[in-house]
């Protein structure tokens, strides 16, 4: 009887400890809406809590993605170049997880679906457990973890625990996607002006405190009205989208590109002084110029004019002051013939 009581007390203590851990995990995961930081937080939480050497997350790259792709911040897995690590949203596994929520091994998935066809990327990882992330009845990610450090199998209690972590992760990802929707321009997939301003203010404060450089670019599509007037607004929309793609491909991790309004864009370049900002601007300008846009049998060329400004704490008392300097430099680029970059003095 005494042994049973002791065992019961130990079990309750374990449950209380797990609940406290889950509370701390929930606080941690919901402390950020930055998608990349959130993914890192989820994976490191799994590594530590489950005592595993490998962890990865299949997630959507953006709101319109038709598949879940293995996020680049995976931990411990050795990837092969000849394998596409993705799971189509329409794959039966996603539907299965929607109606039968729980973590499974690869063998359990094979038995449940009949085969692993279409899951070659998942199978190549050889995960010990596959765990769906489900929020509001929708699968928004698939977590994979490798073998335990001790080498033994996961117990039923551990499976339940990792599902609880997955539930918290799913809610955090759902919140991050909602934030993404409210801060992203749906046409260009770039950030909106109001979000750009918010981040710029934070970066300016950090640059002033840490005495680090910071620059902004203002960019405008040359003769944009001609595309609308000559070919119609659908052509103008395509030009905006294609220009945005070049911007996204040209910026570095940590940079921020946004649609400022109409055919005008802005970029935030942390740890970058004015001359280096001009180099980045020129890379963007040349990239846009080299990009040929096909529209209804025609090949269209696009150019942009750019204004750059390096942050000066003695002059730039507000975000508007800094952006106004970049905007004036943009105006000079247009005055001097367009398709060029001008640095604000």
Enumerate the language-model features and the residues they cover.
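Conserved long alpha-helical elements within nucleotide-processing catalytic cores of c-di-GMP signaling
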Residues: 194-204, 208-215, 225-252, 258-262, ...
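Acidic/proline- and glycine-rich, intrinsically disordered low-complexity segments
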Residues: 78-104, 109-110
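Signal-transducing coupling segments at domain and membrane junctions
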Residues: 103-127
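Catalytic core regions of nucleotide second-messenger enzymes
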Residues: 286-304, 334
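GAF sensory/regulatory domain recognition
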Residues: 44, 56-89
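Catalytic-core segments of nucleotide cyclases and related cyclic-nucleotide turnover enzymes
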Residues: 278, 311-344
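Signal-transmission linkers at sensory-effector interfaces
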Residues: 1-31, 36-37, 188
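A short, aliphatic-rich beta-strand micro-motif
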Residues: 126-134
